[in-house]
UniProtKB/Swiss-Prot annotation:
Keywords: Host membrane, Membrane, Transmembrane, Transmembrane helix. Disulfide bonds: none annotated. The chain crosses the membrane at residues 13-33, 35-55. One of its GO terms (cellular component) is membrane. It is a multi-pass membrane protein. It comes from African swine fever virus (isolate Warthog/Namibia/Wart80/1980). It comes from the Viruses. Plays a role in virus cell tropism, and may be required for efficient virus replication in macrophages. This is Protein MGF 110-13L.
């Protein structure tokens, strides 16, 4: 998947641009038939551009359907929609496990057996910048694992 499941976001963006394109063409046709002056048309186009720009924080994405991967600043809790991705290549990370009274259950895969809380589970944080995904694992050495998000590799330091 390359850092998470982005298809719903991509589809939402394509629909967003399709709706605005239809609205824009509809406005041009409306302006043509109403014989609106160019000055009025330019003001309304500027207003439409401002509205599109203001709607971007609501979409939580930059204004480009070509940029599919959002940067993820360093965090100890990956987004829920990306948890399976991060836990596949860093399966010993603490954010993949839910521990209660010393017994831990995997958050992603229900068929994983319960384990006792021990050194198998490491404190991890993650980050993603462009197509570079990183794990920061404590107290393992080496404690940083770099990989291409589109061609991920498992962290070798987890093999006991």
């Amino acid at each position: 998947m390359g850092g998470g499941d982005y298809w719903p976001i991509i589809i939402r963006h394509c629909c967003f641009y399709l709706v605005f394109s239809i609205a824009f063409v509809g406005y041009i046709v409306f302006a043509y038939y109403k014989n609106l002056h160019l000055n009025t048309t330019m003001k309304l186009i500027a207003l439409l551009c401002i509205l599109i720009w203001l709607s971007q924080p609501g979409l939580n994405r930059p204004l480009s359907i070509f940029y599919m991967k959002q940067n993820l600043p360093r965090t100890y809790t990956p987004p829920i929609r990306e948890l399976e991705y991060w836990c596949t290549y860093g399966k010993h990370c603490d954010f993949c496990w839910e521990c209660r009274n010393g017994i831990c259950k995997n958050k992603v895969w229900d068929d994983m057996p319960l384990i006792k809380q021990n050194d198998y589970i490491s404190q991890c944080s993650i980050a993603r910048y462009f197509d570079r995904c990183m794990y920061f694992i404590k107290p393992k050495t080496p404690y940083i694992h770099y990989m291409d998000c589109s061609q991920p590799t498992a962290y070798k330091g987890f093999s006991h």
